[in-house]
């Protein structure tokens, strides 16, 4: 984690399947941004939080932004805020996810 030197990128900030769609012409659209400057990996991490996108999305994305070493561990860090937020708002199974994330982070 300490060797990761991300470049600030303007990210969507809430990129999950509920915020993407197709317009009348058949073009893909994204909406409901919560944009901020961050490591581009935060958007990809968010896409994996609630089921993920199709394989082709990731293949095309990683042609532009190749996967960097340690990404799989950073997914947990980048999604921790979102899991805490959902646990605060909805409780339920999100509380167990928070516990699991804490265990994974402590074991890194």
Predicted regions and their residues:
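Short alpha-helical
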Residues: 52, 82, 93
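Short, well-ordered beta-to-alpha junction loops that form the rim of enzyme active sites
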Residues: 13-15, 80
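ATP/Mg2+ or Mg2+-diphosphate-binding catalytic cores
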Residues: 86-108
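Short helix/strand-capping connector loops at secondary-structure junctions
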Residues: 77-86
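Active-site Asp-x-Gly
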Residues: 4-10, 17-73
């Amino acid at each position: 984690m300490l060797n990761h030197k991300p470049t600030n990128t303007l990210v969507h900030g809430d990129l999950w399947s509920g915020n993407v769609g197709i317009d009348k012409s058949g073009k893909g659209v994204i909406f409901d941004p919560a944009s901020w400057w961050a490591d581009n990996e935060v958007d990809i991490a968010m896409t994996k939080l609630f089921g993920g996108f199709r394989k082709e999305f990731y293949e095309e994305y990683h042609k532009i932004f190749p996967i960097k070493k340690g990404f799989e561990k950073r997914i947990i860090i980048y999604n921790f805020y979102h899991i805490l937020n959902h646990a605060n708002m909805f409780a339920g199974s999100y509380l167990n996810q928070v516990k699991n994330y804490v265990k994974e982070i402590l074991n890194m």
